[in-house]
UniProtKB/Swiss-Prot annotation:
Database matches in CDD domains: AdoMet_MTases
Cellular component terms per the entry's GO annotation: endoplasmic reticulum; lipid droplet; mitochondrion
Annotated organism of origin: Aspergillus fumigatus (strain ATCC MYA-4609 / CBS 101355 / FGSC A1100 / Af293)
Pathway assigned to this chain's UniProt record: Steroid metabolism; ergosterol biosynthesis
EC numbers: 2.1.1.-
Designated name of the protein: Sterol 24-C-methyltransferase erg6
Gene3D superfamilies in the cross-refs: Vaccinia Virus protein VP39
A matching Pfam family: Sterol_MT_C
Additional notes on this entry: In Aspergillus, the biosynthesis pathway of the sterol precursors leading to the prevalent sterol ergosterol differs from yeast. The ringsystem of lanosterol in S.cerevisiae is firstly demethylised in three enzymatic steps leading to the intermediate zymosterol and secondly a methyl group is added to zymosterol by the sterol 24-C-methyltransferase to form fecosterol. In Aspergillus, lanosterol is firstly transmethylated by the sterol 24-C-methyltransferase leading to the intermediate eburicol and secondly demethylated in three steps to form fecosterol.
Cited InterPro entries: Erg6_SMT_methyltransf (IPR050447), Methyltransf_11 (IPR013216), MeTrfase_SMT (IPR030384), SAM-dependent_MTases_sf (IPR029063), Sterol_MeTrfase_C (IPR013705)
SUPFAM superfamilies hit by this protein: S-adenosyl-L-methionine-dependent methyltransferases
Any Gene Ontology biological process: methylation
Subcellular location: Microsome; Mitochondrion
Amino acid sequence: MAPVALEQENHLRDAEFNRAMHGKSAQFRGGFAALRGKDSAAQKAAVDEYFKHWDNKPAEDETEETRAARRAEYATLTRHYYNLATDLYEYGWGTSFHFCRFAQGEPFYQAIARHEHYLAHQMGIKEGMKVLDVGCGVGGPAREIVKFTDANVVGLNNNDYQIERATRYAEREGLSHKLSFVKGDFMQMKFPDNSFDAVYAIEATVHAPDLEGVYKEIFRVLKPGGVFGVYEWLMTDAYDNDNPEHRRIRLGIELGDGISNMVKVSEGLTAFKNAGFELLHNEDLADRPDAIPWYYPLAGSFKHMTSPWDFFTIARMTWWGRGIAHRFCGAMETIGLFPKGTQKTADSLAIAGDCLVAGGEKKLFTPMYLMVGRKPE
């Protein structure tokens, strides 16, 4: 694959669009409450810009040129995806936008936090370290890792709306003295060389057009001797791009999750090593012999539910829960309380959910390929 040309950043343009689309909705509670504060014209622009990469482009007709067009606009694609999907994520999943492993008897949000703790533990993050969270979302993992380690964390994000929400949550939890958020493209960070004691990424660098490129940027800003840890989204090496069903699953995941270019485990490992890291540990945590699969909430599987408090999280993911959300979003669009495109975005998330479950069941996809590496002294 040819080197990817980086998109030119324009923070003023992005800030103006954020104000136009989201207004003051970053100050609202997450989920459906925040959807009521959107500007319809800006929402339509985001919908059109995002879905132009997917509409009328089925898996059976996919070409390398189609994928190259998505890679060329990786930053815009990701930014508009989260302009559209953030509130729906918070409604359905909470403020930590990632998957996790589950233990018997473990409530959903406890399992989510444990997954974050496990990465911090594997990396050896300690009190007082200066740590970078690459692709921080609305700051759920960063807040948890600050509380778990007492490190100082900087969250990097290319979406203004998510930064506003992350900043608000940090202030509300009294963590602003330990946690800050910076606007930027992780393919071309503005931090000086050797800035951070440790860097982590939780299911975020999958949005890169080229994993080697983002890993090299992380290597650059990491201090010598520092450690980088990542939970990466990858197709397993059982994935066959010439298999139409495999390709449909991958494309469904990419469509519903704002991904321009997902690759296989072997390519991810090569990218990690080529970036210069000394590989300390690599493992597909989805391959652990867990009794409860990582994708069970997406499957709407009550049989694996271990806490009554998880009922509503699981219920939202059932076929009838998704059906209710589909009809509710459509009705709210019709009466003008939600902007047009909300239902289409929610439907794309449902497609992704089905494909994530299929990818997990068929061992074609993992959202938790763990790689930990050190930058040589």
